[in-house]
């Protein structure tokens, strides 16, 4: 156990363009959202909640003794959904809340703990996670979100663009096929810790222009002057489920695990 009091909220939106009813995806006999909650329990969080906009998701969670509550269906982001949870639950302003994505059934409990600890230790408004990018294809992939950090470890900017840009290296004929030595390129992992007081404020913030164009909700906080502290981990965490191909891969993994029991 971590020794730090914090809560985990798992936003579980039912609708998904690429994977409808994603939270209910069967993984070895249990819905994916329940698998995520089981991993979160191992972090030692004092409360775990599934926040959903669909009665079937709530019923599935509660059938496996996972607390769930209904939230509005019109939230623009997962952070907006968490703000509603804070309001519904009446949590005190200094409560630490970790936002664990509902499509991460293999999330490492230690990373959840690290993120909560980083928020508590840094005094920042938000804590999140990143790891080094070692593959040029990932660096230039707009689906891989990059973060540039300041000297104090806070985020300076997040982008889908290749940042920072090694001008001289990439100007070479084959420069785009490799990354320079000691290149400070980091991939952002979508795990966040906040205080309830921040989430209450976030709900009233005007969306940022950069948030709209990059389609990155964390840019709203940066635009309004909030601090985001970044914990660097050595390697990429286990992959989540974003596509039908991911879903099939994850099903097979859990089926194999069940067969070995």
From Swiss-Prot:
Pathway it works in: Nucleotide-sugar biosynthesis; CMP-3-deoxy-D-manno-octulosonate biosynthesis; CMP-3-deoxy-D-manno-octulosonate from 3-deoxy-D-manno-octulosonate and CTP: step 1/1; Bacterial outer membrane biogenesis; lipopolysaccharide biosynthesis
Catalyzed reactions: 3-deoxy-alpha-D-manno-oct-2-ulosonate + CTP = CMP-3-deoxy-beta-D-manno-octulosonate + diphosphate
EC number per UniProt: 2.7.7.38
Subcellular location: Cytoplasm
Gene Ontology cellular-component terms listed: cytosol
Superkingdom assignment: Bacteria
Alphabetic keyword roster: Cytoplasm, Lipopolysaccharide biosynthesis, Nucleotidyltransferase, Transferase
Database matches in Pfam families: CTP_transf_3
Any one Gene Ontology BP term: CMP-keto-3-deoxy-D-manno-octulosonic acid biosynthetic process
GO molecular function: 3-deoxy-manno-octulosonate cytidylyltransferase activity
Family: Belongs to the KdsB family.
Entry function: Activates KDO (a required 8-carbon sugar) for incorporation into bacterial lipopolysaccharide in Gram-negative bacteria.
Protein's name in the database: 3-deoxy-manno-octulosonate cytidylyltransferase
Species this chain originates from: Dechloromonas aromatica (strain RCB)
